[in-house]
Amino acid sequence: MMIAGAEANVEPLVRQSSKPEFGDYQANGAMAAAKKLAMNPREFAQKILDNLDVSDMVDKLEIAGPGFINIFLKPSWLAKQANFALQAVNFGIKTAQPQTILIDYSSPNVAKEMHVGHLRSTIIGDAVVRTLEFLGNNVIRANHVGDWGTQFGMLIAYLEKMENEQASEMQLSDLEAFYRAAKESYDSDQIFAEKARNYVVKLQSGDEYCRTMWKKLVDITMHHNQENYDRLNVTLTEKDVMGESLYNPMLPEIVADLKAKGLAVEDNGAVVVFLDEFKNKDGDPMGVIIQKSDGGFLYTTTDIAAAKYRYETLKVDRALVFSDSRQAQHMQQAWLITRKAGYVPASFSLEHPFFGMMLGKDGKPFKTRSGGTVKLKDLLDEAVERADKLISARSTNLTVAEKSAVVEAVAIGSVKYSDLSKNRTTDYVFDWDNMLTFEGNTAPYMQYAYTRIRSIFARAEIDPDTLTGEMQLTEEKERTLALKLLQFEEALTAVAKEGMPHILCQYLYELAGIFSSFYEACPMLNADEAIKHSRLRLASLTAKTLKQGLDLLGIKTVEKM
């Protein structure tokens, strides 16, 4: 476009075409560029084509409508690129400018068992982490656990009261019972409550006994959480913990600095930042409290410190916080204060890829039948029970070990894929019947699509790595499949940019459908040798892409189902 006279900053706006008659891609940027140059858009589009030589990759370029450029790619070029993708490391995909990116996700509370409310942040965040890493970025995982606050005073005091300092021997379920009992004692026993408050002060001032007990509580919790992460095939480990306690020493200095800069003022004993960008119900600037009148700090203060630390100390280019949509205003306010204070530059990207709620089929927040919170472990156990029934009804030729692996892969995969395949910004209805089925856009369907392709090679006793020759795209179904395979990178780039794994799910589902059409229309094993090898290479690249795509979602594949 620059050759035709467009400014350097004008985007060509190349998009996948919505219909085959419009080509494989459309370039829509000519109209905006022509407007800036006061030219006729179609004439400007023609000027672009007159100065463009892409004959090695393009069959045809045509101008449509007010100035769209339709691009039809050559089958020979598609075949060459697909051949390269099959042989190259990571399909030949790499990021031109890798970044250091921090992903804040999962973030359960210490001394409590993980529940379904932690599921979305954990699996959506992890899918984005995996994708960003695959694209060549340096990714820092940050598990922003709730490991600070008055609850630790209660827990330490109650453990002492029960003469049980062997916290490391306790199961987390005991800790939950301890938490409830400690809260009851705190509410009903003034002497106990005073001791708990004293322990909070001691903990914050570095008292060795309190710090030791606190560390035990954190370690027990994270060990238990790790079991959930491992079972979910999530890449978080205990070394990724960056809890609230990490930022606690920074908070007094931040409050003092915000006051010194005139951003924060004292108001009825509390320290408040008034933001003109947010109005209260009376139309006045909204006050955001960063320190309570009793001296305590708030989540906003911690999030300001976290943003500052991530830029100054970790030196990241982007920081993404995966939490639910109810946190949107809170994050906006914390980051607005962060920027007003000059703690991060405009170039530092602070992003809140929020998600909706997890609902039951009744449209209400997902609960147990008795109305309680569903523990994550219990949810995964039920998934395994249901997946066992699904697989038992279909598969009879699996060994006990094979069946166990299939059941676990389908169970966990179904829970994850059902969520990941939905646009994260919407509320998500959890429905066992819709996720544990081989019909439609589900994990079992996707896992079977992969296994089905692998079985072609197994039955024919062909090692896909031994296939030779170049790909030939003589049939339309072959061409369509090759084009879709080469759009894998585009799907991953969109996930990385938008933090939306459902884009990858939709791509994989469409790929599986296109392969199915190809499989029905284009015989493989009975074709001429050159065609046979070409089609088997396409099948091999499809299997490789499905496996890699599912792996980026944190979903396991199996060789037999």
From Swiss-Prot:
PANTHER family: ARGININE--TRNA LIGASE, CYTOPLASMIC, ARGINYL-TRNA SYNTHETASE
Gene3D superfamilies, per the entry: Arginyl tRNA synthetase N-terminal domain (3.30.1360.70), HUPs (3.40.50.620), Isoleucyl-tRNA Synthetase, Domain 1 (1.10.730.10)
Organism lineage: Bacteria, Pseudomonadati, Pseudomonadota, Gammaproteobacteria, Pasteurellales
EC number: 6.1.1.19
Biological process (GO), any one: arginyl-tRNA aminoacylation
Record note on quaternary structure: Monomer.
Principal location class: cytoplasm
Motif 'HIGH' region location, chain numbering: 108-118
Protein name: Arginine--tRNA ligase
Alphabetized GO MF terms: arginine-tRNA ligase activity; ATP binding
Annotated disulfide bonds: none
HAMAP family in the cross-refs: Arg_tRNA_synth
This protein's UniProt keywords: Aminoacyl-tRNA synthetase, ATP-binding, Cytoplasm, Ligase, Nucleotide-binding, Protein biosynthesis
The keyword DNA damage is annotated on this UniProt entry: no
Catalytic reaction list: tRNA(Arg) + L-arginine + ATP = L-arginyl-tRNA(Arg) + AMP + diphosphate
Locations listed in the record: Cytoplasm
Family of this protein: Belongs to the class-I aminoacyl-tRNA synthetase family.
